[in-house]
Amino acid sequence: MASEQRWIPLESNPKVLNKYVHNLGMDAGWNFVDVFGLDPELLAMVPRPAAALVLLFPDDKETVNQLIGEYQSDYPDSLYYTKQTIGNACGTVAIVHALANNENVIPFDAAKHFKTFLEKTKPLNPEERAKHLEQDNLMGAAHGDCAQEGDTQAPSQDEHVKSHFVALVHCNGTLYELDGRKEAPVVHGTTSADTFLEDAAEVVKKFMARDPEI
């Protein structure tokens, strides 16, 4: 990574993620929840509408480099995409991708920091957005506070964790995988607000076929 800055990794835990995003100003009526399986009866347990899916998977270079989907370098301006330059910040980058691409769906408190962060970074390109996050002390502090809130002991910021967060989002009828370490957003076909969760589940199945440890 271009930056030597490192954060403490986030735990994949809805309680942790919800405290984080609600402190940043996401409406309390919206929450992260666990998805317990990809079968229709388990997906039916997920509250609707589902605005985004955050996926955590083993960070194995041999499998991660096997691209699923196709890069789209000429993606629409309405898709918010940022690079990741902070070590262990993939949880926050996935959250930013999930929230920023649902600004028209999820209310945000204008007095809280995420709304300000979004307004400042929307005009920037992905590299500039990453640089802004590096320098945003409030985002860093919010991440650090919640990284200590998990059910397991938080690793040190210097630890190289063997897992990675990405976000799956819907934008203009297309399902995108947003990963700040990749060269561009990855397209996974068409979707809609009504079918997003089921379509995203099909993408997750492809991840699982690539890496059975997921």
Curated annotation (Swiss-Prot):
Location in or out of the cell: Cytoplasm
Site feature: Important for enzyme activity: 179
Top-tier EC class: hydrolase
CDD domains with a match to the protein in the record: Peptidase_C12_UCH_L1_L3 (cd09616)
Top-level lineage group: Eukaryota
Keywords associated with the record: Cytoplasm, Hydrolase, Protease, Thiol protease, Ubl conjugation pathway
Reactions catalysed, as given in the entry: Thiol-dependent hydrolysis of ester, thioester, amide, peptide and isopeptide bonds formed by the C-terminal Gly of ubiquitin (a 76-residue protein attached to proteins as an intracellular targeting signal)
EC number from the UniProt entry: 3.4.19.12
Residues carrying the site annotation Transition state stabilizer: 84
Domain UCH catalytic span(s) in chain numbering: 6-214
SUPFAM superfamilies per record: Cysteine proteinases
Broad class of the protein's primary localization: cytoplasm
Gene Ontology terms describing biological process: protein deubiquitination; ubiquitin-dependent protein catabolic process
InterPro entries (alphabetical): Papain-like_cys_pep_sf, Peptidase_C12_UCH, Peptidase_C12_UCH_sf, UCH_AS
One Pfam family here: Peptidase_C12
GO cellular component: cytoplasm
Active site (catalytic residues): 90 (nucleophile), 164 (proton donor)
Listed GO MF terms: cysteine-type deubiquitinase activity
Function: Ubiquitin-protein hydrolase is involved both in the processing of ubiquitin precursors and of ubiquitinated proteins. This enzyme is a thiol protease that recognizes and hydrolyzes a peptide bond at the C-terminal glycine of ubiquitin.
Family stated for the protein in its record: Belongs to the peptidase C12 family.
PANTHER family for the chain: UBIQUITIN CARBOXYL-TERMINAL HYDROLASE
Name the UniProt record assigns to this protein: Ubiquitin carboxyl-terminal hydrolase
